[in-house]
């Protein structure tokens, strides 16, 4: 888990996505508006973050809402500081 988490955190765009999700849950479209990139590019970053367990998603009708998985973030920080 830690290896995937650190790999996911190595990209500045993904770190910024996590910062935004720390403020509030968002859709891929809302996140894409914060960057100069397409929704598919943001979705790729979100998939990487999901695979690392740093982000969770939940479908609400037509939308998928992404959230920061604070438990995994705390575990990752604990492992790093450990």
What are these regions (language model features)?
Residues 9, 21-24:
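Short helix-to-turn junction characteristic of helix-turn-helix DNA-binding domains
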Residues 15-17:
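Pre-recognition alpha-helix immediately N-terminal to the DNA-recognition helix
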Residues 19, 43-47, 62:
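Base-recognition residues in the alpha-helical recognition helix of bacterial helix-turn-helix
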Residues 27, 38-41:
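Helix-turn-helix DNA-binding motif, specifically the short coil turn and the N-cap/start of the second
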Residues 31-32:
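A short acidic, leucine-rich amphipathic alpha-helix
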Residues 50-60, 67:
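Beta-hairpin "wing" of winged helix-turn-helix
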